[in-house]
């Protein structure tokens, strides 16, 4: 494996190489490559989002984050169907992520929920056909981020331009990297494979219904940062209940641990470098292969932004409440939904 090929490995792959190292020299080499990968990734991400902020305004820096997520994921991941059809679907997904979150913010919580359900149905049914590729962690997360950081007026016009550029970049990279791959299925096959009795379809329906429901309830309760609850729910919903229960436990414990660590850093560090706590969290996520640790470090970035608006106490309270509510609601909802579907299946 070349230096460049090793740089392409994810955290789990890199750590697997470290564990299999037989000599100190070999292990030191893999550690060096791993650290270089983290440094290069962080530098590239920071530069990419900064450029988007300069071009389209600081209020649209989140567009840079969403586009970056799509580029990094879909340069390797696919949608499981013909490359041409997949490319057109990606363009459609960008249209949905650009328009629907903005429109949903203009509606009442209930009407917004219905629009979000319709939008997520397209993203998940056609973009997340394989749950174990975790495309929902890109598409649904991107949708929720744009929903939570909505803008209006001139800023939204700039957002339209930024997302159009992001769509063009993502589709170009995706098509270039996948055009020589052979796929035997097409868009119609995805429709025909919709089966209410399958674990995949039940998982998709849970994502489609539960995430917007969580957003709606949080907004009806006048809870700021409703997207946090939605992201927590999305992250916890998996096809198998045992995996969901594991995620819920790790999400709750990870967020509480992250809040405690962030609070300690907040009081120890000078106020001039508070914003860099989020960058520290990004590095931590890059070094983490397990979901629990990722939940800890993801908290840093979220709180670094939220403390500017709500203060430390308000941001910490919101983070814990929204995450616990999101994952617990998702667990209860999916447990009932899976049980109901199993009862229906027996009747059929």
Task: Kindly give the residue locations of the regions a language model identified.
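Alpha-helical transmembrane segments and their membrane-interface boundaries
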Residues: 1-137, 141-297, 305-348
């Amino acid at each position: 494996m070349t230096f460049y090929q090793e740089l392409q490995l994810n955290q789990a792959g890199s750590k697997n190489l470290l564990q299999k190292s037989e000599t100190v020299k070999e292990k030191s080499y893999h550690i060096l490559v791993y650290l270089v990968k983290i440094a290069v990734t962080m530098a590239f991400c920071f530069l990419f989002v900064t450029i988007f902020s300069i071009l389209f305004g600081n209020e649209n820096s989140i567009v840079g984050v969403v586009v970056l997520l799509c580029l990094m994921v879909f340069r390797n991941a696919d949608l499981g169907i013909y490359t041409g059809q997949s490319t057109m679907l990606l363009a459609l997904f960008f249209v949905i992520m650009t328009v629907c979150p903005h429109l949903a913010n203009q509606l009442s919580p209930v009407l917004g929920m219905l629009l979000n359900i319709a939008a997520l149905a397209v993203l998940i049914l056609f973009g997340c056909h394989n749950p174990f590729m975790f495309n929902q962690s890109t598409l649904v997360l991107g949708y929720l981020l744009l929903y939570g950081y909505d803008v209006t007026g001139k800023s939204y016009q700039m957002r339209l331009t930024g997302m159009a550029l992001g769509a063009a970049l993502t589709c170009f990279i995706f098509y270039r990297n996948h055009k020589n791959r052979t796929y035997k299925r097409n868009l119609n096959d995805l429709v025909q494979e919709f089966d209410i009795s399958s674990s995949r379809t039940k998982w998709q329906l849970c994502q489609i219904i539960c995430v917007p429901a969580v957003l709606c309830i949080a907004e009806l309760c006048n809870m700021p940062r409703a997207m946090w609850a939605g992201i927590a729910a999305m992250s916890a919903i998996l096809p198998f209940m045992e995996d969901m229960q594991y995620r819920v436990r790790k999400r709750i414990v990870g967020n509480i641990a992250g809040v405690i660590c962030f609070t300690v850093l907040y009081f120890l560090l000078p106020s001039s470098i508070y914003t860099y706590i989020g960058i520290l969290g990004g590095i931590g996520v890059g070094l983490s292969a397990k979901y629990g640790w990722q939940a800890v470090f993801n908290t840093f970035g979220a709180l670094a932004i939220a403390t500017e608006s709500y203060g430390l106490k308000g941001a910490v309270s919101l983070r814990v409440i929204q995450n616990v509510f999101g994952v617990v609601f998702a667990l209860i909802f999916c447990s009932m939904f899976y049980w109901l579907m199993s009862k229906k299946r027996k009747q059929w």
